[in-house]
Amino acid sequence: MKQVSRSALVSFSAEQMFHLVNDVARYPEFLPGCSGSCVLEQSEAHMVASVDVSKAGISKTFTTSNQLTPGVSIAMSLVDGPFKTLRGGWFFTPLDEAACKVELRLEFEFSSKMIELAFGKIFNELTSNMVNAFTRRAKQVYGE
């Protein structure tokens, strides 16, 4: 199973970063490779959402069930998509009132070797850039 772990120290609160990452409906506005998104279910502690990823003529949609702990974490597990397994999440560790560590940790395995060959590089690229994309988005939304 492949693993991705990316993190950044940002000058925004854990609460602010949680809200940006949890705003799935806005992903296509700023997340490279994201061509669409849809929130299917939502409550204060839970969300089911789909994200469409497109690049180089290849498009895939995956759906996750997300357990929400506001300002602390978003734990994700696969509902549907091109994966045999996808789990992990976002973690927000306060450093002080106006700074935090943002971390994305994922474990995944594609449903077939063919899908991995077609989509693996695109998914790796997307996940590698996600923390940076959210950091840039925070600067746009909350200011430098």
Curated annotation (Swiss-Prot):
Protein name in the entry: Ribosome association toxin RatA
Keyword Thylakoid in record: no
MF (Gene Ontology): ubiquinone binding
Recorded family membership: Belongs to the ribosome association toxin RatA family.
GO terms under biological process: cellular respiration
Keywords for the protein's UniProt record, in alphabetical order: Toxin-antitoxin system
Gene that this polypeptide is encoded by: ratA
Role description: Toxic component of a type II toxin-antitoxin (TA) system. Binds to 50S ribosomal subunits, preventing them from associating with 30S subunits to form 70S ribosomes. Its antitoxin is unknown.
Organism of origin: Vibrio cholerae serotype O1 (strain ATCC 39315 / El Tor Inaba N16961)
Listed Pfam families: Polyketide_cyc
